[in-house]
């Protein structure tokens, strides 16, 4: 019986002090077959145990702004460390020992963030799968497949601060000793999938028909409780409602038909009927059809024997898909949310205290988001495949977009609601090219390049087609309201909505001087403008190269984008020295402060200036590898490859932030966390 077993262990030190990650894995696979291979069984089981300690993400920024002339420790008169004041780590504030008063405006120092906070997590996960495939005896063209899956995980997270730390002295509930919390998370996913497949060839015909059923159940449970340090007094939990439990179901009936004639003309039709418990009974089901046709031109008689053309296929298709991954399991239900603040309770007499229950916003008519895609493509190959690739034109029209939007005052129970907001169009051209310019006995060179030109815009956002209707989104650190971007018809998602900066004759920005676009003599929200700039690139691409010479191999991979914009929120939030100077401290100023010389308090509008909006086009060399393979070492019949590699080699960009590739979709950069460069030396041995 075929089987495979493996054991793995990973121990990785983080970029920051105190951060680390450990993982242990165990895999087992069994693949028996019965009845002359008509019945095949695949059993897979994988167990994973992880342990991780997190370092505070704010420590990088804190260290960058910390005054380098200050001793990072509090000292006694004899030079020893004064552990009675914030555990010895220097922090902004006044007084010493128990009389220490923290400067909450400037926050904890970098050493306190690193060593006086303990945030650890331990997790266990099991992934199991059993797949049974049966080919009917005497009618082998028909087979049945049953797939059963289970994914279970549990995690426990500890997050707390040390007594006597800066963080403990800023805790209004437990001043001086602080508190900690335990959070437990449980996830379980069941899968049952069954399908029948009929595959038959006769003469010049090939028919492949499949019909199936899929059922999934997702369950989650979360529980969190906080304690005061030292006294271990429990708080923050209502024992009557100790857990947050949620679940959802996904049900599907589906079918697919593939039919080809002489391998020249290929037809495909698919149909899915999906149901999600995240929607009400009236909108739960979604029907999503698709169809495609391909013409294998290279198989036609006029090209079949061509030496120049080795492959040529024309493809056209249209199809629909549904989206229900919205992050909420009950968006159509009216629900109440319980307060977690022990000071916000109702006194219920002998029943004790009950936490506040607040109604949440909901949409009883929320339904599937539907995307219709039109595609025309051409696959090609020339000179025996030494030049090959594809080019595709596509148009994606998404209707009933699912998103959270701000609700008009008094129209719902909450400031935002998850609902269907309108339609969006995405169109473009994507291509993939591969070349083999050199191919000899000793030399082989392969070059690949792929790219996509795209344009995305909203085509509808409400039922009245109001051209001025918009949805504000995209929070930044400073400012009133904090929303920097707008969804609006005719513009790309997350288009930046800024004030226009004024500059002096030398090109330097003038603090709090912005363009009065409506010419009413004052700067108001009406002076903001649609910049027509968004984080969505006009073009993104990838490049690869692989070179072989005898036993040597060399290669690299890179990718990049053009036309994408990023708002440097870190620069915006730290664009003036006013806060630091007024706090009576002299830390390291941000580079932008030194450049602009801003010393006044920024106006509420200055934070939204387009001076912080930057072109984030870039090219990143992802990795470079060089290796050598030893095929013969004495009488040994195996082989050995030694390779050296570098990941995150370099980035070419005009963006002033640390990294033009920022997490998330809205293009707002509020972090200065660096991406590591990794050097590796690898040894692969084959027996």
Enumerate the predicted regions with their spans:
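Surface-exposed beta-strand-turn/loop segments characteristic
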Residues: 1-6, 10-20, 92-105, 581-582
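Calcium-binding motifs, dominated by EF-hand helix-loop-helix domains
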Residues: 513-517
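Extracytoplasmic gating/loop element in the C-terminal half of outer-membrane beta-barrel translocons
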Residues: 111, 276, 506-508, 561-642, ...
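A generic structural motif
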Residues: 11-15, 275-277, 437, 535-537, ...
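C-terminal extracellular loops and terminal segments
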Residues: 416-425, 466-496, 527-542, 574-579, ...
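Extracellular/periplasmic, surface-exposed regions of secreted and cell-surface proteins
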Residues: 23-24, 29-35, 40, 44-49, ...
